[in-house]
């Protein structure tokens, strides 16, 4: 986009305004694709960072519908989550049938996947009613701090490393390790 900036205007403000403008279709489709991938394990465009015209969505009508709804809602993420979770694809069971046993491209069923290391640790802590104590003491991480809230991988927690927490230098969630390394 061509920004008309005044002499003392910060170009970052103009860029941020353009990013979240309804006139910018890329922001909505990128966020819809990431949220879809978060809930269903794979984006409508896969890989999620490859949104070239030569790599179309598996369901372009659904992508357009969700993107339009997201823009019309004023970029309301809660509404986007409701829209994704109310789709037929999200509500499918994981049990295979002869028709969908080998289908991995069309969201014909739910594909079970492992919990992330942070979610697993938080779940165990909640079920056992024993809060996890993180290095640095209560001054740095007060009681009740969840693993999902940790700021970076510099907080040394062996459990998280063993169960696949990626380093922050990894740009893609696909770098998350899915096999336990016990």
Predicted regions span which residues?
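Catalytic cores of secreted/periplasmic lytic hydrolases that degrade extracellular macromolecules
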Residues: 153
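Primarily short, surface-exposed interaction patches in extracytoplasmic proteins
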Residues: 1-144, 149, 157-161, 166-176
């Amino acid at each position: 986009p061509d920004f008309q900036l005044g002499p003392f205007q910060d170009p970052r403000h103009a860029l941020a305004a353009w990013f979240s403008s309804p006139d910018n279709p890329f922001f909505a489709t990128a966020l819809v694709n990431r949220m879809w991938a978060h809930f269903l394990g794979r984006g409508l465009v896969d890989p999620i960072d490859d949104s070239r015209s030569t790599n179309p969505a598996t369901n372009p009508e659904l992508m357009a519908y969700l993107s339009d709804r997201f823009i019309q809602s004023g970029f309301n993420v809660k509404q986007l989550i409701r829209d994704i979770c109310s789709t037929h694809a999200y509500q499918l069971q994981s049990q295979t049938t002869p028709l969908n046993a080998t289908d991995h491209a069309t969201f014909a069923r739910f594909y079970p996947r492992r919990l992330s290391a942070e979610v697993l640790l938080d779940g165990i802590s909640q079920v056992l009613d024993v809060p996890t104590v993180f290095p640095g003491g209560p001054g740095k991480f007060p009681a009740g701090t969840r693993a999902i809230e940790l700021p970076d991988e510099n907080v040394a927690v062996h459990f998280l490393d063993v169960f696949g927490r990626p380093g922050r230098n990894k740009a893609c969630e696909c770098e998350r390790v899915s096999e336990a390394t016990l």
